[in-house]
């Protein structure tokens, strides 16, 4: 018989995930159907989103191999029935306070930085780049993790060195770019561009660097269809950029610069977003989401 979620102490909650304590060495990481955009948690959930994020993370942890925080199978007996398919048993780690971002294409906050300074996080880039330009080489563009409701702040590699030391900063950069390189090649073989991705790492008791949190999901990554890719325009996507675009478009009536929260999402935006998340999982993994746990 599986335990109930109430039997675990709630440790922390974020925009999308909740952490519960299982024992001294293990946590339960639960992905909700909440969706965030522009540092707001929207009032409208996306059905099955948490299950897609969990399925995608498990798939890519398997593809990447190496050290990661998984400590059980997706149907582990310690996972309560009510969160089966959207929860994982993971190792308790000392999380590194840096968002590790790799970019192979210029878009989002990276494009804003580039247009203002000609660089992203202190990394100088060639002149003449536009929305969705492919970069000469992938770059490491870290960010300082913000509190709920605050903006993540892009920082330089030197700021990471000051925060965690030279050796760990180099390891974070190298591991992030390695994961991005392998994952982008994997996605490209399936007709999908991995424009960028955000990773998080933790340290175990022996100070080994461990890949943690979610990995290469539609929440933490920008996925574009390779068919029809054209620099200079906003790309169609398999991620929450679709929601961002609706929020900042005329139909939502929302002013991002105001203090008001975003409006509820219309049913057609909810369903289209759900479909995009599932399509990303199925196209990249080659698996049917209908066969996923839960």
From Swiss-Prot:
GO terms for molecular function: ATP binding; phosphoribosylaminoimidazolesuccinocarboxamide synthase activity. Signal peptide: none annotated. This is Phosphoribosylaminoimidazole-succinocarboxamide synthase. It catalyses: 5-amino-1-(5-phospho-D-ribosyl)imidazole-4-carboxylate + L-aspartate + ATP = (2S)-2-[5-amino-1-(5-phospho-beta-D-ribosyl)imidazole-4-carboxamido]succinate + ADP + phosphate + 2 H(+). GO terms for cellular component: cytoplasm. It is an enzyme of class 6 (ligase). The gene is purC. It comes from Rhodococcus opacus (strain B4). Coiled coil: none annotated. It comes from the Bacteria. Keywords: ATP-binding, Ligase, Nucleotide-binding, Purine biosynthesis. Transmembrane segments: none annotated. Belongs to the SAICAR synthetase family. InterPro entries: SAICAR_synt/ADE2_N, SAICAR_synth, SAICAR_synthetase_CS. One of its GO terms (biological process) is 'de novo' IMP biosynthetic process. Pathway: Purine metabolism; IMP biosynthesis via de novo pathway; 5-amino-1-(5-phospho-D-ribosyl)imidazole-4-carboxamide from 5-amino-1-(5-phospho-D-ribosyl)imidazole-4-carboxylate: step 1/2. The lineage of its organism: Bacteria, Bacillati, Actinomycetota, Actinomycetes, Mycobacteriales. PROSITE patterns: SAICAR_SYNTHETASE_1 (PS01057), SAICAR_SYNTHETASE_2 (PS01058). CDD domains: SAICAR_synt_Sc. Its EC number is 6.3.2.6.
